[in-house]
Amino acid sequence: VTGMLNVSVCGGNTANTEFEFLTGNTMAFLPQGSIPYQQYINGDLKALPDYLKTLGYQTIATHPYNAGGWERDTVYPMLGFNESVFKDDYVNPQYVRQYISDESCVDKIIEFYENKEKDAPLFVFNVTMQNHGGYQDQYGNFTPDISVKDSTNFSLQQYLSLVKLSDSALEHLISYFEEADEKTVIVFFGDHQPSDAVASTVLAKNGMSWNHLTEEQQKLRYQVPYVVWANYDIGEETGADTSVNYLAAEVLERAG
């Protein structure tokens, strides 16, 4: 199943996309500039991990960066996660630029799966860091290998090269669970589009600029791709556009 997700943020504020996906709530009814993780979640809240826990799932959240970012270490348990795993819990991870790689995140997910109780259901929510902005600096451990014709924008080259690495990590994840005995669903989606430093070049290549976008074109900056894959039959669909706050419910319905 593939399509585009409507999200409420662009260029940052990943926590708001997390909030919408995990709780099913929408940012549309909160004041502009709100960060629910920091302002509105002060106790246990009904959410996807809490629901899955009632069905017997072990629920794990992992984010290979600082535990206190967006107060995740405080909020995740309130949403129903049994365990939260952050940067310091990764042993000898691979780094791309200054962030733990998506490949190391895949290894961690596989580790969770292989260490769980046999036949016990598991839900892992993984928020990656590899492709975090900005993209203007050069690093000794990463050299962009994608270029854009007639463009010297290094930030764009680095961003696209990082996305390529994410594709490879996703391929590894799917290849592993294709062989798994237990039914498995993988939901892969973006939190937000990159910053204007990347997007401006793409617009220019298409003869466009920020000052001359229609309302419909501006809305496209708040869409990200998603894919739902399973190692059993959940049906196939392309162009299944939706909003991130509906995604979890739609996945549960498909999962059966």
PLM features per residue range, with description:
Residues 1-256:
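Solvent-exposed soluble domains appended to multi-pass membrane proteins
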